[in-house]
Amino acid sequence: MRDTILVIEDGSHLYEDTLAALQKFSSFVSKGSYFIVEDGIVTELGMKKKFNGGPQKATREFLKANNNFIIDRKWCDFFGPNATFNVNGYLKRIF
């Protein structure tokens, strides 16, 4: 079994940069480990255009192409429904 790995993406929050980071570093995340995408809240704060769709758009696109990751609602909703700056940003590798 591979080591437990945590990758955190907290870059520019631009859609393109976030998607590139997800694609480049997701292979390092072992089964049962996490890839956290920071600051998806920019969409909720009305800054989606500034960030070309931002982290949430990148996450949605990444998940469509990578069914080995899921959004882990346990962490997204720990304090209430998406009560986090990392909206839909806790990605768990399931296989």
Language-model features: where?
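C-terminal substrate-binding/active-site "lid" region of AdoMet-derived donor-dependent transferases
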Residues: 5, 15-95
